[in-house]
């Protein structure tokens, strides 16, 4: 007779936990997608800043002469 209430309680606990894995899977997918978006935004932002810096550097010092100087110094 004592087994019946325990069985009912376990059945209730199991039924409430059944919907949880789907929710956590969806939540983890959403979190992963958000992190990938944030990572891509960071890369685009970093590359944009890097390209702007190189463009500015190209205006100050011509990139061709800078590369030529670097290549000639590595030959020595």
From Swiss-Prot:
GO molecular function, one term: toxin activity
Propeptide positions: 20-52
Main location as per UniProt: secreted
Tissue occurrence: Expressed by the venom duct.
Cleavable signal peptide: 1-19
GO cellular component, one term: extracellular region
Subcellular location: Secreted
Keyword annotations: Neurotoxin, Secreted, Signal, Toxin
Organism domain of life: Eukaryota
Transmembrane residue ranges: none
Entry keyword Signal: yes
Family per similarity comment: Belongs to the conotoxin T superfamily.
Something else known: The mature peptide does not contain cysteine residue.
UniProt name for this protein: Conotoxin ArMLCL-022
Organism: Conus arenatus (Sand-dusted cone)
Taxon lineage: Eukaryota, Metazoa, Spiralia, Lophotrochozoa, Mollusca
């Amino acid at each position: 007779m004592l087994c019946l209430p325990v069985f009912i309680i376990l059945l209730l606990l199991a039924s409430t936990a059944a919907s949880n894995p789907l929710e956590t899977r969806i939540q983890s997918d959403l979190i992963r997608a958000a992190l990938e978006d944030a990572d891509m935004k960071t890369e685009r932002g970093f590359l944009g800043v890097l390209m702007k810096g190189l463009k500015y550097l190209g205006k100050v010092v011509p990139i061709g002469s800078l590369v030529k100087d670097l290549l000639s110094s590595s030959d020595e």
